[in-house]
Amino acid sequence: TMGIALKYLGYSMNTDDIAALEAAKDLLISQKTQGIVKAYQVDETKDKMIAGEAAMGVMWSGDAQYAITQNPDLAYVIPKEGSNVWVDCMVIPKAAKNKTNAEKFIDFLCRPDIAKLNCEAIGYSSPNAGAIELMGADYQDNPVMNPTDEDVANCDTIHYLSDTLLLIYNALWADVKNAK
């Protein structure tokens, strides 16, 4: 939420500029006190959107894809100011006892036929070229699953926050949550 406010104001989601962070906090508090925002939520947003209890929400693309399948009156957009880009990663710990089986499992998930099934089951896009080909034009032309290069160009990959910056973010967010 803080990141989206930063993008709206023209800043990177990764800024450490205190004035920019304060401006984002002030924007969020203003939205809240004016009644523009019903609630700052994460997982509950898709359910509220599906039920028609909210007019707009910030959510992960997979949640949006699911919500649209449940309520065709919904649409998904990436704000012109941008958003965030994210990925889920698979790792094998150095001390893993079954490294060979872990590698086999990752290889299995990367098979195009399995990656296709996984994508269809979870509603999130796939970087697997073979899976994308198997899913066909409906998937390839879906802007929720495959945003344009122009949309992605305006987006930030969120970087690690230093311990100091994390404390600042937490304090600013507490101000937003406690605003009446």
Spell out what each predicted region is.
Residues 3, 27-31, 70-94:
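Periplasmic-binding protein-like
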Residues 6-11, 29-33, 50, 54, ...:
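Sec-exported extracytoplasmic/periplasmic mature domains
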Residues 84, 93-153:
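Mature extracytoplasmic/periplasmic domains
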Residues 1-53:
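Extracytoplasmic ligand-binding site segments that recognize negatively charged/polar headgroups
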Residues 46, 50, 68, 93, ...:
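Generic hydrophobic alpha-helical scaffold/packing signal
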Residues 47, 149-180:
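Conserved C-terminal helix/tail region of periplasmic/extracytoplasmic solute-binding proteins
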Residues 45-48, 64, 102, 115:
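Short, hydrophobic alpha-helical packing/hinge segments within bilobed ligand-binding/sensory domains
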